[in-house]
Amino acid sequence: IFMKQIFRIPTDKSYMVAPGQSIIITNSAIDHTQTAMNAFEHNLLNADFEAKDQQGKTTNNPDVPALELVYTAYAAISNMNLSQGGPGGIVIFETEEDVANWPLAYNYGKTSGNKWMKLPAKYILDGVDVLKNNAQTGVDANLKRLYDYIDAGYANINAANGYNGEVMYRKVQSTTEDGRKILSDTNNSLSDFAISSEIAPREFK
């Protein structure tokens, strides 16, 4: 899998996520309700990790641990380069290898330009394909970036460009007797994810 960026949760200590719990990873761990004019912004002061902007264009929170940047294809971009509305693929992987030594490659058929890091697919634990919803033609499934065995479907928001408060969230499949939420994981994001403009960080439904 060709990756434009790879981040790692810090290895200075063990960061365990208990069953039914979650972590928040953001580019800017601030109270966005105080800085934005949009009612759909959230307070992210309690985020668990933050992708720090080494160029200083994004406001960072020194009290939130830094997400470790392992690789970026763009010298001027050190935080998470996510496209509002898509397209893009996001994966979680685990390996004991030295990721920094993985090979780099140009785009297929190219001999210049940005280089992508080659992630062995065998290390991928989960992934979601995020596709753009074109206002005129809808979602083009031919633009999927992940293999079907990682994500047989895709997720998308309704808006074409984002910035309208819509988020994609993984749906609750069931709830245990003690109240713990078990999330849907069929390896098909069309079934596993839904869209909301009201759900809050760390909220499940």
PLM-predicted stretches and their roles:
Residues 2-184, 188-189:
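Solvent-exposed beta-edge/loop recognition patches
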